[in-house]
């Protein structure tokens, strides 16, 4: 039986509560498998279960939304909730900062802990002094050619000028911009005040749980900035502005390449559903953003930057696979329970180089393949499923796949997918179908 036919037949009309429950249970499973139960089922099966939870969430969300109309929200109700959303955002932010503060205080920025922030500081220092940013770093214990895209380090130029710790700046961006975008979309949903309050505090609760479980996660990295970008992307998918959609795409593409396979699917959906004009505006603005942020100021001065960065990724992967062994003699980050690299390390070819190559090819095939699957399902179900929700659910499934097959599945990287789940859960309501804003071409 075809997957689309199965979804239609396996979805009793009065079973919306079942799909709602499935989404919440899947979110709980993802959170547990990244916090208290991380690696509980072993380094081989824990990442499989984590990915399965993401698949279940996407399946339940699709089943919930089939044949449900995406109604518009009332502006009066939205305006009433915006101040409350802002208050809850501040309260949640204070909760996160109170938990994050001890972690940052006990982990100074030093190569003794991590090289991530030191590298970002070097980029920023070079940029502010007018030096060439993309040349070999000489302040580390090993030679490294810069392999970070501009929007991984450019946001910290103001922080550096103001003398603010990059980690606080990153968390502030997530709380104010990323979660602010989430709160704005949530305020527009026709749901009860109780459900609104519960969902309003959900993102900050996830951050708190992640930090409490592993204080290093956002104290040794600036990952909250990247999570912020993807929250903006998820919110823009549900919004109406071509400018915001393009801005979010530029932020994501120019910080990491993670979303690159999903972008053509999203533009195709916009072309079909909204119209060629809107899709072309989004594509053009995104292209201009990439040119303005990366190609013209940096890449055009040295076209080998891109290939150098790819080579550094390979070198870093070899270093992780061949070293950083834990008590069991196995690479710590590969066997941390967040990615299937452990399977390829255990059962792959004898040579480590060959194992990595097999995983990289599988990663590309899986990432591209899941986009093809999502596109096919969207096309088959386009009459029963709102395209904006199809794009959001597709983004969740794609990112879950992409990060599951990473060559170095760091916990802080994988945590990003959890916050896309929050947007999916936000869109399934306890009472009636939540609202999705009508999309028009607007700047």
Q: For each predicted feature, which ranges?
A:
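Start-transfer (signal-anchor) and selected internal transmembrane alpha helices
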Residues: 1-99, 381-397, 425-443
